[in-house]
Amino acid sequence: MKHRYLPATDQDKKEMLEAIGVERIDELFSDIPESVRFKGEYQIKKAKSETELTKELTKLAAKNKDTVTYASFLGAGVYDHYQPVIVDHVISRSEFYTAYTPYQPEISQGELQAIFEFQTMICELTGMDISNSSMYDGGTALAEAAMLASGHTKKKKIVVSETVHPESREVLKTYAKGQYIDVVEVPSKNGTADLEALDEAVCEDTAAVIVQYPNFFGRIEPLKDIKPIAHKGKSMFIVSANPLALGLLTPPGALGADIVVGDAQPFGIPAAFGGPHCGFFAVTKKLMRKVPGRLVGQTEDENGKRGFVLTLQAREQHIRRDKATSNICSNQALNALAASVAMTALGKKGVKEIAWQNLQKAAYAKEAAKRAGLEVAFEGPMFNEFVIRLNEPVEKANERLLEKNIIGGYDLGASYPDLKRHMLIAVTELRTKEEIDTLMNELGDCHE
């Protein structure tokens, strides 16, 4: 009789060994030398009851620093934003929560329409023609954009500003290495891309130029000035954008971008130790057939009713296998749904209002930093992040801030050696005047 819970009872093991003609399990490992085999018992704790285990895990989880008890000024790609209550209610519905790739449209209309709405909203924010159903995160979306550009132009050089998120650049390099693509990083000047250096780096062999908007330091890159440089030599212009900032800023599509990517985390997706997230990928119409990931299209059924289907599937690996131009398997559809619900709940006015609050509160925080005697590293247009210079290591300052129930900013010295003792501060709509003043006063006291 098979046991309901144990995967391999003694009887199961006996039957399997007899079937393969082996007497003992040890014989299966005869190829492994005795000298390197592990012998003895694993140091595993004794089994606990459910109540004991729950208490232990609750105690362990209490050690985490959350953004409810603590005021978070940590951004650098993952932000503490308001999540409409309705988001969790919708994504927890079983038909969404357990849904996989909707290959059969006749039984997946709800899922397909939700993805279609996500694509529509991303196009509205970015000013682009086509959006896919989602990517894994902002970093992989950026790397996939570079691969698309290289394949489309048949060129093997990618020029990227060092003001692009350092982790996204690392993902890009990982992708590029396997494709023998050369990644050239261009230095910054006063917190934005150095346009002269960018112009010098772009040549006839350049497949694409990549910038971030707003960039990693919080500054607004001059896309209008970068566009002619990026398109020099028929290379492509890729912009990695914060979707919330696009509630206020001119869309990259209106400024000449060929591909716009980013991470939808600001909309309805919690920080959650860095993931999972939801990348987005939007392009001009001419690149539609080269977009990675799934595309949901609108159509009509035989009765003339509106319906939704996976379209242009010939690009994908379940159709073309090794010749596919898209190799995204199970995408982030659930997180895309969360982002869609959040954007819908906020509406156009709500997205703009939250973006405006981010801008205003960050501007107030920057002035508060100056009043506290702190030096702001880069002056100029910004969104919700800026950089200050400290007289002490950022790590030390952040340890002290934790005692005041504040999660401090990102240590830029970890990614930029010339910016040691520089802190990247993020200010979202959730931060209060009192929290901002407390942060700056604490940092200012140690700056004197």
Swiss-Prot record:
Top enzyme class: oxidoreductase
Keywords: Oxidoreductase
Catalytic activity from the UniProt record: N(6)-[(R)-lipoyl]-L-lysyl-[glycine-cleavage complex H protein] + glycine + H(+) = N(6)-[(R)-S(8)-aminomethyldihydrolipoyl]-L-lysyl-[glycine-cleavage complex H protein] + CO2
Entry EC no(s): 1.4.4.2
Protein task: The glycine cleavage system catalyzes the degradation of glycine. The P protein binds the alpha-amino group of glycine through its pyridoxal phosphate cofactor; CO(2) is released and the remaining methylamine moiety is then transferred to the lipoamide cofactor of the H protein.
Subunit structure: The glycine cleavage system is composed of four proteins: P, T, L and H. In this organism, the P 'protein' is a heterodimer of two subunits.
PANTHER family, per database record: GLYCINE CLEAVAGE SYSTEM P-PROTEIN (PTHR42806), GLYCINE DEHYDROGENASE (DECARBOXYLATING) (PTHR42806:SF1)
Family affiliation: Belongs to the GcvP family. N-terminal subunit subfamily.
Protein's name according to its UniProt entry: Probable glycine dehydrogenase (decarboxylating) subunit 1
Naturally occurring in which organism (per UniProt): Bacillus licheniformis (strain ATCC 14580 / DSM 13 / JCM 2505 / CCUG 7422 / NBRC 12200 / NCIMB 9375 / NCTC 10341 / NRRL NRS-1264 / Gibson 46)
Gene for this chain: gcvPA
